[in-house]
Amino acid sequence: MSASYLTDPLIFVIDALLSLYILAVMLRFLLQWCGAEFYNPISQFLVKVTHPPLKVLRRFVPPIGKIDTSSLVLLLALQMLSDFSVLMLKGVMLNIGALALLSFTQLVTLLLNVYVFSVFASALLSWFDPGGYNAASSILRSLTEPLLEMCRRFIPDVAGVDFSPLAALLLLQLAKMVVLPPLQELANLIG
């Protein structure tokens, strides 16, 4: 039996649990930043799940304007913990700068993926239940509307068809192609 027989399942569990919690913290940050409905059941779930560590962090890390900096600090700390744990179990050690940059890159990737999923899901929901209300569509609308509104300024409706979701998806994919490779390369150089 190889060593990976035991470490691979452990890596999977650590990565899965921390990734889910990181996603919850990121969604809470984004929904708070976008001004999403606080009493929405999804918002309430995210607040309750992420409140304990944020309550402690807020004593030391105050918000800056509309930006909840304690959520950002928690995101980076959790991602660094996840990356450090996984790399350590794989026998790879990085210096703190490379680890921080790797974690930042993964958070930017997650942010872009959250928006890609949100725009896509919001567009699908608008086709099947236009004007309908449910907790998920309200959250998705709050999250995507600022980005879609920006796209609508440049791309008007054509024959009643809104192409802003398509434009937003193209912009998000372009951002992935332009922003992420230099960050990954820099992390490789530092590490």
Where are these regions (language model features)?
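Selective transmembrane helix interface/packing segments
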Residues: S2-G191
